[in-house]
Amino acid sequence: MIDFWKSAIRQQFHAAIDMLANAIKACPDSVWSAQGQGAFWYLAFHVLFFLDLYLSSEDESRFRPPPPFGLTELEPEGVMPEPAYGKDELLGYLEHCRKKLDAVMSAMTEAWIADPCPFSYRAMSNGELLLYNMRHVQHHAAQLNLRLRQTTDSGTALGVKGRSERQGLTLMRA
C-alpha cells in the first residue's frame, strides 16, 4: 500500500512543481523584474527555498541551499536577496528541488512518515510536513499564475499529473 501512496504523492507534488516551473518560464521580463516583496522573482524564490528546506532531513540551523542562494528567507526582518535572481537560476534551483523530492520519496518508509519533522516550530510528522510543503508550492504557483493572468492576460494550465508520470513512473496498485 505504501508504494501506491508514494507514487500518488510524488505525481501530485511534481504537478505542483510543474505549475511553478511553467509560471516562471511564462513570466515576461517586465513582470519578472518588478520590485518589492511581491515581486514575481521573489515569490518564486521564496517557494523554492522552503520547498528545499522542508525536504531536508535536518532543521534550518544546518540547512544550506545550493549556491548562489543564501539564507535570507530565515531572517526575521524579511531581508530581500540581492541582486534579484534570474529565471535560469531559479529553474536550476527548481531542478535541484525536484531531485531532492525524488530522493525523499524513494527513501520514504512508514516509520519515517510517522516520525516528527525536524522543525520545532512545525508540530507535525514528516508525512504531514510533506503534504504541507506540497500545498505551499501549489499556493504560490497559483498566486504566480493569477499574477500572470492579471498582468498579461495569460497563464499556465493545471496539470493532472507531474512530470515524473510522463517519464514512466506510474501509479502502482497495491
Task: Label each residue range with its predicted role.
Residues 6, 25, 87, 99-100, ...:
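Context-gated lysine
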